[in-house]
Amino acid sequence: MECCRRAAPGTPLLVLAFLLLSSRTARSEEDREGLWDAWGPWSECSRTCGGGASYSLRRCLSSKSCEGRNIRYRTCSNVDCPPEAGDFRAQQCSAHNDVKYHGQLYEWLPVSNDPDNPCSLKCQAKGTSLVVELAPKVLDGTRCYTESLDMCISGLCQIVGCDHQLGSTVKEDNCGVCNGDGSTCRLVRGQYKSQLSASKSDDTVVAIPYGSRHIRLVLKGPDHLYLETKTLQGTKGENSLSSTGIFLVDNSTVDFQKLPDKEILRMTGPLTADFIIKIHDLGPADSTVQFIFYQPIIHRWRETDFFPCSATCGGGYQLTSAECYDLRSNRVVADQYCHYYPENVKPKPKLQECNLDPCPASDGYKQIMPYDLYHPLPRWEATPWTACSSSCGGGIQSRAVSCVEEDIQGHVTSVEEWKCMYTPKMPVVQPCNIFDCPKWLAQEWSPCTVTCGQGLRYRVVLCIDHRGMHTGGCSAKTKPHIKEECIIPTPCYKPREKLPIEAKLPWFKQAQELEEGAAVSEEPSFIPEAWSACTVTCGVGTQVRIIRCQVLLPFSQSVADLPADECEGPKPASQRACYAGPCNGETPEFNPDNGDGLLGGLQDLDELYDWEYEGFTKCSESCGGGVQEAVVSCLNKQTRELADENLCVTSRRPPQLLKSCNLDPCPASHLLSREMNEVVVLADELCHHPKPSTVQACNRFNCPPAWYPAQWQLCSRTCGGGIQKRDVLCKQRMADGSFLELPETFCSASKPTSHQGCKKDDCPSEWLLSEWSECSVSCGEGTQTRSAICQRVLKTGVSTVVNSTLCPPLPFSSSIRPCMLATCARPGRPSTKHSPHIAAARNIYIQTRRQRKLHFVVGGFAYLLPKTTVVLRCPTRRFRKPLITWEKDGQHSISSAHVTVAPFGYLKIHRLKPSDAGIYTCSAGPAREQFVIKLIGGNRKLVARPLSLWSEEEEALQVRKTNPKEALQTHKHQNGIFSNGSKAEKRGLTADPGNRYDDIVSRLLEQGGWPGELLASWEVQDSAERNASSEEDPNAEQALLHLPFTMVAEQKRLDDILRNLSQQPEELRDLYSKHLVAQLAQDIFRSHLENQDLLPKPSEQRFPPMAVPAHKHVSGFSSSLRSSSGEAGGGSRRPHRKPAILRKISAAQQLSASEVVTHLGQTVALASGTLSVLLHCEAVGNPRPTIHWTRNGEAVQFSDRILLQPDDSLQILAPVEADVGFYTCNATNALGYDSVSIAVTLAGKPLVKTSRMTVLNTEKPTVTVDIGGTVRTVRGVNVTINCQVAGVPEAEVTWFRNKSKLGSSHHLHEGSSHHLHEGSLLLTDVSFSDQGLYSCRAANLHGEQTESTQLLILDPPQVPTQLEDIRALLLATGPNLPSVLMSPLGTQLVLDPGNSALLGCPIKGHPTPNITWFQNGQPIATAPGLTHHIWGAGQILRVANLSGGPQGEFSCLAQNEAGTLLQKASLVIQDYWWSVDRLATCSASCGNRGIHQPRLRCLLNTTEVDPEHCTGKPRPAVQPVACNRRDCPSRWMVTSWSACTRSCGGGVQTRRVTCQKLKASGISTPVSNDMCSQLAKRPVDTQACNQQLCVEWAFSSWGQCNGPCIGPRLAVQHRQVFCQTRDGITLPSEQCSALPRPVSTQNCWSEACSVHWRVSLWTLCTATCGNYGFQSRRVECVHVRTNKAVPEHLCSWGPRPANWQRCNVTPCENTECRDTTRYCEKVRQLKLCQLGQFRSRCCGTCGKA
């Protein structure tokens, strides 16, 4: 009990020291972290349920700022709120109900799912479209979106995972489990195809169980889906799904879509009931339903707790189990339910040791608990592996693995396997001999045996194993052939042989004596023995040998002899001729022509002798590579003895074969003289014979697997100790040279290392810099510093700090740098006036002459020639020039050899090149200005710059640089003004702000006739040409001298030109632009001359006429256009063109001017001194357009005060207030018209252009009107209300809706919004909530004017999605009458005669549609004989007393201003009756039995139906009619077959065949067989039968009685039962399946089964009361006679008695303090009484202690 000892006297001092040390350590860590104080306690949760937020604060203990945040958040109260709690956002909105908004109280409803700012409190006034942001932030814990767990904290939306943790991205899986792996459910998908019949109109598609998720069904076809549900409480329900919509079915949301060709059903889930999806037959065609959903696995394995320990002391163990648990009913069920799901894997039992305390000495032995098992733990034991099933090519071997247990005495017994499941079971099967089997490897072919004609060639074929060694075991059947014929194209003139010359086996096999003998295999084959001796001693004799059919028995590895017919293939010869040498001194040469006579029929004497190789000669060299020659000898093939070479045919002698030898290099030696046989190396050209090959193939078989390491990779570090890696793979080099990558287990050698150290030397010392400190000041200019330490990385990889002298000198700029914050405010002056400012120049520069250097100020655009040096200056105020920074295309610029960033604030680019083009940005603190540089090519074209160089940031800066209005106009008009719809324009390339002026500058460069043209011709001339041109035109050189180096234009001037061009018609824009560009070029040049005082006086002319063209003002452009046809010359005809009015920009009007002259598109303000107003209107077109004027939409009434001038201008003399309005010039010709307006106001008062007409739109997607009228349109269109205003100064336009002011852009309702642009109001996707009065108010200093337009939304007639209202109306009109709803496609209602019916016309629309009824296309009122009534505002039609037959088609036509809708339905009166059809076919073709039977049909409206419908209807009387009553032709008549003569093995059966004739009277008489033979072939009268084999069951004798015990002294014995023929041939068992099979198993008496369970007496109970007492006994299986223990499995036929039980399970009396266990004395001795569990059980003993 060490934990309870009192501390030693010195302990408090040690604790105090430890606390002080800990405090220092914590304080040092805090110093590094910025001196933060500890986090404070968590605040109260912002919500009590539904997920809220809590925060904790900390404070900074330093006087400086601390890094990090001083607040942190966490989620809390993550429990669902009760249903009555309501929405948290709605509660915050309702808190403002008692606060007046604009003087009025509203009931506020929440506006959720705002995509722009989800954490602001936006609420909508109930009953209105007013949406207001009542608070910038919602309370912490409010959900950002209704369908998300993300919550708002401090006004920002924070991500919350399904685990309710902030910042967590954990999501639910498809089963609804947070961060699950999808294993608790299974994906179910399938397809159903309807196969409905007339009697069955409904069918079940699929049953979707409770808890399923993500359900989707799609029905394609005419049928209809509907639902049946059943809750866990047994409540059933049904939903017909009659219309599209979202329904709540048993607390589950159902999304149903009913489309014309299909139906779609979606349910997110989880389902709260079992759903049965059914289909209802509505059409003749089949329907298909595809479904998919995730079904929960409701039965899962659940691991139990540990069982009680197997022993009370001394060490035991305890196990767990697994039980199948039903998640729906929350109860344990049978295991079979968990086996239904393959995903369910039953957990293995767990085992752990327990009660490891030694047993008390008084016990004697430990008590056994639930299991009769002993220490140590059970373990797996395995038998040795069996032999491999295959010697190569991959086999298997197995072993037995069992669970055993060892008791205290060391006895090992087998136990159940589950007791060893706490460790993995050893494998019982493993692969073996997975190497390849030996296979044949063929060598190269030898040369042909002949030099002419036909011969043979040979090759060596070896059997090679997987290691590349020569071995046996290859199949002889797959051996490649070793010889083949070869043909030499050289003809032979004296052939000796008729047959091909046959050579012997190649040298590589014979010379090395590798010939293989015949081997016995596992397949039966002929095996010859050795030949006998020759029968004669000289001359020709014979030899014999024995041929046996043998097979190798693999299991015994012995050879067995078989009958000869068991071996396939030809049998080898058993006799052959032999020759023993010449007799009586005969000549040893034989004549082949006499062979037949000498050998007495033997084929060829030459076969006795043949050439063979007999090894090799000695190597020609001892080192350095020599040659061996194969020795060829003539041998007797029978005796294998050498013979005279004359006995072998010379032409068959094999070729000379060589092989290399002694390839090792020779050791160094002294040079030898020529007299000592020195080898002299000569040039290859001096050798006449072909040079031998220096390369030959060798060892062409697979190499054994080996390790192949790759090259080492680069070292991970350049110094300081790094790591090198390489790949080491196990590969096998194949015979063809390729490599096969193998698993590492195939390589037996040790694997080379794949890692090694490298660069094990110290690194040079280097500076380690810290982060920059904060700026030294809070405003203005300060400094930042950072510290630096000198460190070195040692070869061990450890960094160490060294002396700073060992590091290179550190630049001053590396440790200190300036910083610039906001300018400090001066007393009494706002600080904003003292921020840095850059004095930019908004100019366009175009270089026209070569110049070495040009200076520019930022803020403009420069188009320059290459090789020009450029200096960019950035003039600033209130900012130090050394702090100015430069960027190019968004990248920071630094000084280089080509670009210089000077410390004085300017940038210098040396000799421009194409890569220098771009946007240069000068930054002075927060102030930024840009300068764009572009290059001009040699052909006066701009050098293109890649588009990718522009960044979005540069575009944003360029657009932001200009004022908003100018930027809007520029982007609106700059695209496509010059390009006329080029590809670049269509791609939006010209929207690049850096390319804004490229088009107009390109036109300026291309402009002919302006002074810059002199440059192009002057600079390309050499000096001689230039002098000559000067002599011819002295003014040209003088003009060039005064040309500027750069032309300068203001950006505003070019912006005005672009804006003016954008207002011109497209057909005139190109022509108009040429004049503007020419005028611009002239103005630029004149401006330069004026600045230089060089502008010529009217009397003098310095420049030639071509150099400075006559100046033409733009205002004269229209007149030149009008006369262009006459000026063209040649009488060429102009193309036809529709009218176009020229838009022009006039100078600003002077209010004091008495006469006002202006162009269209302007505003005229009438003052008191205005005497005349002249409105110009210039139009072009072919034919020439006619001009007429209107005022406020009405034609102008001309008078002596209002005049039309000859040039179609309108002049107003002495204008008065009645003349105020919008004057419109209309130009018209045969091709079209054009119109432009001009406003005339009184003293600058606002004027609004109005239109009092009513616009009705039902088809167009957009509507555009002037304010002042009424707009009636359908939903979903875009409505634009123009409010064109005029006034001086310009009037401000304000829009109102129902007298409420509208902002610039706002959402009116979900899916609709409005936008204000240049005084116009655009309403997108209008709906009913957009109806109202829209007012435009124009106001300026002189007054205001308001005009309004009423917007009415029309809804065309359509079928409502919810049909409950009209169904209730039908039910109220006629509760018991059949009814049908009309539909656009048509419906049908089948009625009985005399019934009445209700027809409903479901319709909705705005205004309410008018309904008209028709029958068969005629008005219902004119239908003859039809009683009808119309109710329910025309929606219900009742027709009464319908008679038989079809009633035709009824239709209802609904119409209003927005459109019409026709719906149809058909009424069919069903009446079934019997109809007599035509007579059926005669029942016989002859004789006396033929009759016609009339056929009855059940009809419904002339359609045949099931006869059951006519049950009860009167049947018409019908009588059969006789037919075909005549004599039949003769025919064969046969009797039945007789019984078979044998039951098996083949028998015969017969029948009688006669020829007979049937008379018309019905009598059949026999006739001659010839009469039947003429008509048909005589049937057979005999046939074979019972051809099957005669089989029977056969069986062997009973085996020994050694089967498993099934009772006392009772075991099982077996015998074999098989099917065979009566001849003893075994057949498959199926052949005897028709016969009763004899039994193959029977019970028998066995002495080994004379066993029974023997139990000992129960031990004493471990407790006298309570729930902890138990007792045990020993249970064992013993033999009845010997009474000795035997294995327990012999007693398994009887139940095993329990070996432990609870005892003394009675409650202990609390009042009596006594011992309840017999171990209390040990408890007292071990001093365990102070522990509660021992003190309670040993109350008496512990009380005494």
Swiss-Prot record:
One GO cellular component term: collagen-containing extracellular matrix
Keyword Transmembrane helix: no
Protein's cellular compartments: Secreted, Extracellular space, Extracellular matrix
PTM info: Glycosylated. O-fucosylated by POFUT2 on a serine or a threonine residue found within the consensus sequence C1-X(2)-(S/T)-C2-G of the TSP type-1 repeat domains where C1 and C2 are the first and second cysteine residue of the repeat, respectively. Fucosylated repeats can then be further glycosylated by the addition of a beta-1,3-glucose residue by the glucosyltransferase, B3GALTL. Fucosylation mediates the efficient secretion of ADAMTS family members. Disulfide bonds are present.
Low complexity bias spans: 1115-1126
Glycan-carrying positions: 251, 310, 391, 451
The protein's name in its UniProt record: ADAMTS-like protein 1
Lineage: Eukaryota, Metazoa, Chordata, Craniata, Vertebrata
Encoding gene (name): Adamtsl1
